[in-house]
């Protein structure tokens, strides 16, 4: 499932609109991830609190959205653009790749809640495809 030129334009446009609330979306998406999929808390055992809405979860959610925005800027070559993040997650953090898909789903839910009018079916498809390609790029070094 590759991204067409129209998909890329749609993603860039939507993320431009979303920039004012991206921190909130990142924090809420990660909060939902640890609440709905509690096994993901194991990656954050070193935090004082990995509870939904806690300060460390919010901070890391913001960091994640920063990475997603970086990926939007590298949308034409995600695998090459995200190679260092792939290495980090594969070799140092040892994140199970399935978690990228789970987080992507939580992001979609949050985006649709915060931007119900802008999150049209066309935007949904384009952003879903983008997040799937992003997850695939992050898995590059797992092979």
Curated annotation (Swiss-Prot):
Q: Name one GO biological process term.
A: hydrogen peroxide catabolic process
Look up the record and report any one GO term of the cellular component aspect.
haptoglobin-hemoglobin complex
The gene name on file is: hba1
Q: Does the keyword Transcription apply?
A: no
Q: Where is the Globin domain?
A: 2-143
Tissues showing expression: Red blood cells.
Lineage here is: Eukaryota, Metazoa, Chordata, Craniata, Vertebrata
What is the protein's given name?
Hemoglobin subunit alpha-1
Domain of life, source organism: Eukaryota
Record organism: Boreogadus saida (Polar cod)
Q: Which keywords, in A-to-Z order, does the entry hold?
A: Acetylation, Heme, Iron, Metal-binding, Oxygen transport, Transport
Q: Which family does it belong to?
A: Belongs to the globin family.
- Say if the entry is tagged with keyword RNA-binding: no
* Biological role: Involved in oxygen transport from gills to the various peripheral tissues.
What GO molecular functions are on record for this protein? haptoglobin binding; heme binding; iron ion binding; organic acid binding; oxygen binding; oxygen carrier activity; peroxidase activity
Q: Name one Pfam family in it.
A: Globin
Binding, heme b: 89
Q: Which residues carry this modification: N-acetylserine?
A: 2
Q: How does it assemble?
A: Hb 1 is a heterotetramer of two alpha-1 and two beta-1 chains.
* InterPro entries reported in the protein's UniProt record: Globin (IPR000971), Globin-like_sf (IPR009050), Globin/Proto (IPR012292), Hemoglobin_a-typ (IPR002338), Hemoglobin_oxygen_transport (IPR050056), Hemoglobin_pi (IPR002339)
So where does O2 get bound?
Answer: 60
């Amino acid at each position: 499932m590759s991204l067409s030129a129209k998909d890329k334009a749609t993603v860039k446009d939507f993320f431009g609109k979303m920039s004012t609330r991206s921190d909130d979306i990142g924090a809420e998406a990660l909060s939902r991830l640890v609440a709905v999929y509690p096994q993901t808390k194991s990656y954050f055992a070193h935090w004082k609190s990995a509870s939904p809405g806690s300060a460390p979860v919010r901070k890391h959610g913001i960091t994640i959205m920063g990475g997603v925005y970086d990926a939007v800027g590298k949308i034409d070559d995600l695998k090459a653009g995200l190679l260092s993040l792939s290495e980090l997650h594969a070799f140092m953090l040892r994140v199970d790749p399935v978690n990228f898909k789970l987080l992507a789903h939580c992001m979609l839910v949050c985006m649709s809640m915060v931007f119900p009018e802008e999150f049209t079916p066309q935007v949904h498809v384009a952003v879903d495809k983008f997040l799937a390609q992003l997850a695939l790029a992050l898995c590059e070094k797992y092979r």
